[in-house]
C-alpha cells in the first residue's frame, strides 16, 4: 500500500513540474499581436578615430560613453531618448566615437514592423505614431513567439513558396517567417513576418 502511495505522489510531483515549466515557457513567450509603434531608437556605438561622429555630451545618449580619438573617456551622454535634452547642435571636435550597450544594428528603427514592447530589444526605446514614448524593449535577445494560431489569418504568402497563397495555416504575426505576409478573409494585410521572429518549441 505504501508503495502505491509513494508512486502516486511521484506522479503528482512530475505532473506539477511539467505544468510549471509549461506555464513559465508560455509566460516568457510574446503574444501574437503586432504593436502599433511608429519608430524605435536604439543607441548604438558610432564613429571611430578615423571617422569621428558629430555630437556633444549634451545630445549624446544616456548609457553611451564618448571618447577622444586616443581612447580617453570624455563623458557619458546626458540625453534620455524618452525625453531628449534641448541641446546646441554643434559638433564637439574632441569627441571621436561612442560606445553604447547595443553595439550593433541601426540607431533609428523605422518602420518598426511587427515589433512590440515584448519583442523589442532592451536598451531600445519605442515611440507611437504620434511621437510619444511608449516603452523600453524587454528582450535581451528576441523572445520566442507563442505558437497560438491567429484566427484572423485566412491565408499567407511567403517568398519561399513563390508567393502562392497558403491556406489553412496555423501561424501568427510574431511566428511568421521573414517576408511572409498574413491576410484576413477580405484580403487585407495583417502583418509581415520579421527576421527577429523566432518560435518556441
Swiss-Prot record:
Signal peptide per UniProt = 1-23
Domain of life according to the entry: Eukaryota
Q: What conditions trigger expression of this protein?
A: By viroid infection.
Question: What SUPFAM superfamilies does the record tag this protein with?
Answer: Plant proteinase inhibitors
Keywords, ordered alphabetically: Disulfide bond, Protease inhibitor, Repeat, Serine protease inhibitor, Signal
- Residue stretches of each sequence repeat: 27-83, 84-143, 144-199
Please name every pair of cysteines joined by a disulfide bond in this record.
Answer: 30-118, 34-114, 42-124, 54-91, 57-75, 58-87, 64-100, 117-135
- Per its record, what are the GO molecular function terms? serine-type endopeptidase inhibitor activity
Q: Where is this site: Reactive bond for trypsin?
A: 32-33, 147-148
- Report the family membership: Belongs to the protease inhibitor I20 (potato type II proteinase inhibitor) family.
Q: Which PANTHER family match?
A: PROTEINASE INHIBITOR TYPE-2 CEVI57, SERINE-TYPE ENDOPEPTIDASE INHIBITOR
Write down what this protein is called.
Answer: Proteinase inhibitor type-2 CEVI57
